[in-house]
Amino acid sequence: MCIRDRYDMVQANIAIVDQARNGTGCAIVHSDDAIGIQHLNQEASKALSAGIRAGFKISKARAMKWITSNPAKAAGIYDQTGSLVIGKNADVVVWSKNPFSVYALAEKVFIDGGLAFDKKSNYFPSSDFDVGIISPNKNRIEE
């Protein structure tokens, strides 16, 4: 992103899209970044705050749709995922606080119906999420 792009950006853009078509817009908070995608709740919170500052009346429940049901609708898979409904696929995060708070921590994460993370557990599986593909013949620490 160049400096000019930063000056030209509209911080309330997500809220503006949300309010399009008489409040039926399909706003989406997304990230192309491996780290940013882990903080979509915080990005949605920033977008919600920018929208409120711009004068839009948007509830936290509506803003939550920006990272849940709206992306599923946009991808054409809302009949399969995007909301907690019997018969749909869903991963669930149990938060310690309001998920729009920077102080919120994931307490538990359920993926495909199974407990994948529990903050109270001593077991923390390692992940190559932000490391990338590792050569199977090398040790990542020595690379």
Question: What kind of feature is each model-predicted range?
Answer:
Residues R4-W95, A104, F110, L115:
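His/Asp/Glu-enriched, well-ordered alpha-helical/loop segment
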Residues Q19-N22, I111-E143:
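Extracellular/periplasmic ectodomains of large secreted or surface enzymes and adhesion receptors
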Residues L105-A106, K120:
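Short, solvent-exposed loop/turn and secondary-structure capping segments
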